[in-house]
Amino acid sequence: EPVRVAIVGAGYMGRGIAHQFLKPLTGMRLVAVSNRTITEAERAYTDAGLESVKYCETLGQLEETINSGDAAVTEDWANICCSEQVDVVLEATGEVEFAAHVAMKAIEHGKHVVLMNAELDATVGPILKTYADKAGVVITNTDGDEPGVAMNLVRFDKTIGYDPVCAGNINGKIDHYRTPDTQRAFAEKYNQKPIMITSFADGTKLSMETTVLANATGFGVGQTGMFGLECDHVKETLNFFTPEHFANGGIVDYTIGAEPHTGAFVIGYNEDPMNQQYMDYFKMGEGPLYCFYTPYHLPHLQITTTVARAALFGDATATPLGKPTCDVMTKAKRT
């Protein structure tokens, strides 16, 4: 039987995810979309070329529609969380308080929860993880967003016998003083909200994502706000970091302006002389620090691996290890 996925939040990212699930995709099925504006929920289907969509007001209507194989839309997110016809709830609103209610309701009813919502995860992720563990379900951030991409590299490093000591985002640029007005034209070009695009440009989203990554690895930060290394290529992080930077444990950080300008990186440590010789031969440097990176992050595509991982293997892509190791603070841009 295919994994049955329901999406809460049909904004820019929610629609992109729906589009991927509505194309030929082995072993998974998008069964419902919930949004406070029902026309946007319908759009998640119609943008993918599916015109026949059924509006479901009650839980009974929702379950009947899913059972019949039809596309369901609803304004009532709680029905999605309660439905026995849903295996995975994908939260993609970008809200914190509302999304916390969605996650808790889904966990209460035995659903795995996939978060396309770094804001929620950075704020109360460790608390939600505690409830998910008690309920025997998975709550996880997603592959394709930087924390998930970095966690794949962390697991890879550990698998090959390297100790991950630094992980983070590869950023094009950061300007802490960007505003919705400065970002409006760019937002309109890509059919997004100026306030959301501002959060990408001014470092807000970055801070949330690296906090999610820190809580998933147990890492801290090298300094308040992180170092934010400006360099031409992500591999040049090795020109800055030394083993002494990690004497008190691993850290999260980010690059600015470094090729490949997107994706995530992890610095792994290995001091074995023979390994160092081989790594130098294969153009990875002299060691003992080595930079591993993924030159892309494609959340609307890669999220499918997170859904499968959670539903089929009970395994999380990126989830808090325990209590928070990092948090996000805000600063006023003007007084």
Go through each PLM region and give its residues.
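Hydrophobic beta-strand scaffold residues
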Residues: 30, 73, 113, 138-139, ...
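Short gly/pro/ser/thr-enriched loop/turn and capping motifs at secondary-structure boundaries
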Residues: 39-40, 120-125, 129, 146-150, ...
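N-terminal glycine-/serine-/threonine-rich beta1-alpha1-beta2 phosphate-ribose binding loop
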Residues: 1-105
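Rossmann-like NAD(P)H-binding beta-loop-alpha module
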Residues: 132-136, 140-201, 205
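C-terminal catalytic/substrate-binding lobe primarily of soluble NAD(P)-dependent oxidoreductases
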Residues: 1, 186-335
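Rossmann-fold NAD(P)-binding glycine/threonine-rich loop
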Residues: 93-109, 116-137, 142-144
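Generic secondary-structure signature for well-ordered alpha-helical cores
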Residues: 22-26, 46, 50, 130-138, ...
